[in-house]
Amino acid sequence: MEVHMLSKDNKKSIRKTLEQRRGEYAYYVIKEVADLNDKQLEEKYASLVKKAPVMILSNGLLQTLAFLLAKAETSPEKANQILSRVNEYPPRFIEKLGNDKDEHLLLYLHIVYWLRENVDRNIDVKTLLSQDYSKVLWATKEAIALLNWMRRFAVAMLKEEGKENEGSS
């Protein structure tokens, strides 16, 4: 699937495949976490991003999203309020969270924002419960494809436990 986007000067069209857009989005959301220079958040977020595809394959997209909200102690309504305040691209979620920089909530927001842009504008945990199987399957495949990109960038850009000392011996 190709998408035509205008370049920054809005004069020529740039063709980007869905895979390119996934990679671009993944880069920006991982960079947002890296730019905080919060080692603890980076470690926790990187670990969670690596585990998320397996969680989705084992438990399903709905249960994984519900798990992320439960661990963040956040309601779907609160998460939707945060998502509704994001009106820029690339999205800047961390500034919308204030002091509540939880890796679970952040990953939920990153996944759901992407799904809203590429599957259905109204997607969240509640709406996925009432969707037909084909839409849930589509959303699941999109989430896993996105997380594969995010995992690659997380490994490259985020601090991980033990990673800093690997090259010093």
Curated annotation (Swiss-Prot):
NCBIfam families per record: cas_Cmr5
UniProt entry tagged with the keyword Cytoplasm: yes
UniProt function note: CRISPR (clustered regularly interspaced short palindromic repeat), is an adaptive immune system that provides protection against mobile genetic elements (viruses, transposable elements and conjugative plasmids). CRISPR clusters contain sequences complementary to antecedent mobile elements and target invading nucleic acids. CRISPR clusters are transcribed and processed into CRISPR RNA (crRNA), formerly called psiRNA (prokaryotic silencing) in this organism.
Taxonomy of the source species: Archaea, Methanobacteriati, Methanobacteriota, Thermococci, Thermococcales
Membrane-crossing segments per the record: none
The organism's place on the tree of life at top rank: Archaea
Major subcellular site: cytoplasm
Oligomer and partners: Monomer in isolation. Part of the type III-B Cmr ribonucleoprotein (RNP) complex, an elongated RNP with Cmr2 and Cmr3 as the base, with Cmr4 and Cmr5 forming a helical core along the mature crRNA (39 or 45 nt in length), while the complex is capped by Cmr6 and Cmr1. The 5' end of the crRNA is bound to Cmr2 and Cmr3, while Cmr6 and a Cmr1 subunit (Cmr1-1 or Cmr1-2) cap the 3' end of the crRNA.
GO biological process: defense response to virus
Classification via Pfam families: Cas_Cmr5
Keywords for the protein's UniProt record, in alphabetical order: Antiviral defense, Cytoplasm
Subcellular location: Cytoplasm
GO CC terms in record: cytoplasm
The protein, known as: CRISPR system Cmr subunit Cmr5
Family, per entry: Belongs to the CRISPR system Cmr5 family.
